[in-house]
Regions:
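A short, Lys/Arg-rich alpha-helix, primarily the initiator
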Residues: 1-20
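Residue-level detection of the helix-turn-helix DNA-binding "recognition helix"
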Residues: 12, 37-38, 51
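Short alpha-helical DNA-recognition segment
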Residues: 15-33
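DNA major-groove recognition helix of helix-turn-helix/homeodomain DNA-binding modules
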Residues: 44-60
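The DNA-recognition helices of helix-turn-helix-type DNA-binding domains
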Residues: 28, 39, 64-67
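Short, solvent-exposed alpha-helical "recognition" segments
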Residues: 38-44
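Short, charged recognition helix plus adjacent turn
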Residues: 9, 15, 34, 61-74
């Protein structure tokens, strides 16, 4: 799972711009592009992003955890 790509896709799905997102995060566009390149994101930042985009990005980690637990039972 690559959370940065998932965040970028959700931003596109909502029709939001990188400039808008950067303003909401109180950072510049360069930092937003760096977030898009990350495979993982600090939980506090992910929480802020989830609130800004009204999208639960933690569910992707929960889903992955459930899949991992299912594999261990086999």
């Amino acid at each position: 799972m690559h959370i940065g790509k998932i965040i970028r896709q959700e931003l596109r799905n909502q029709g939001r711009t990188v400039t808008w997102f950067a303003k909401c995060l109180y950072c510049d566009r360069t930092n937003v592009y760096k977030i898009f390149q990350r495979e993982s994101v600090d939980s506090e930042l992910l929480y802020r992003i989830s609130r800004i985009l009204s999208h639960d990005f933690f569910k992707y980690y929960s889903r992955e955890l459930e899949e991992d637990e299912g594999e261990e039972e086999i």
